[in-house]
Amino acid sequence: MMKKRQMVIKQRSRNSNTSSSWTTTSSSSSSSEISNVRYVECQKNHAANIGGYAVDGCREFMAAGVEGTVDALRCAACGCHRNFHRKEVDTEVVCEYSPPNA
């Protein structure tokens, strides 16, 4: 019996208005989904109180502390909360299936 492996990689952004979906049908298949979350550029508007728009240029979130502490949600580079950074979710779907016997 020959096993084949199919990988589909999806990338979603929190600001994305589009959504995509897919379905896979097969006689005998199993799949698993692996998600990797990254927080990239800071989008905090530092000039909002004067009616302007200015970002600090921070390109990627780096936690200021270890996981489980309050500092884990603060960026070591810019000092902003993690929610000000754009969230990217990379989802990897791995499907393993065996073709039906002919």
UniProtKB/Swiss-Prot annotation:
Biological process terms in GO annotation: negative regulation of DNA binding; negative regulation of DNA-templated transcription; photomorphogenesis; regulation of meristem development; response to abscisic acid; response to auxin; response to brassinosteroid; response to cytokinin
GO cellular component: cytoplasm; nucleus
Tissue-wise expression: Mostly expressed in roots and stems, present in siliques and seedlings, and weakly observed in petioles, leaves and flowers.
Segments traversing the membrane: none
Pfam families: ZF-HD_dimer (PF04770)
Stretch list, region Disordered: 1-34
Any one Gene Ontology molecular-function term assigned to this protein's record: zinc ion binding
Comp. bias intervals (Basic residues): 1-13
Superkingdom per UniProt: Eukaryota
ZnF region ranges: ZF-HD dimerization-type: 39-88
Subcellular location: Cytoplasm
InterPro entries with a match to the protein in the record: ZF_HD_homeobox_Cys/His_dimer
Keywords linked to the UniProt accession: Cytoplasm, Developmental protein, Metal-binding, Transcription, Transcription regulation, Zinc, Zinc-finger
Keyword set includes Nucleotide-binding: no
NCBIfam families noted in UniProt: ZF_HD_prot_N (TIGR01566)
Self-association state and partner proteins as the record states: Homo- and heterodimers. Interacts with ZHD1, ZHD5, ZHD6, ZHD7, ZHD8, ZHD10 and ZHD13.
Function (record text): Inhibits zinc finger homeodomain (ZHD) transcription factors, such as ZHD5, by interacting with them to prevent both their nuclear localization and their DNA-binding properties. Involved in integrating signals from multiple hormones by preventing the expression of genes involved in gibberellic acid (GA), auxin and brassinosteroid signaling and by promoting the expression of abscisic acid (ABA)-responsive genes. Regulates several development aspects, including photomorphogenesis, apical dominance, longevity, flower morphology and fertility, as well as root and stem elongation.
Stated name of the protein: Mini zinc finger protein 1
Gene symbol of the encoding locus: MIF1
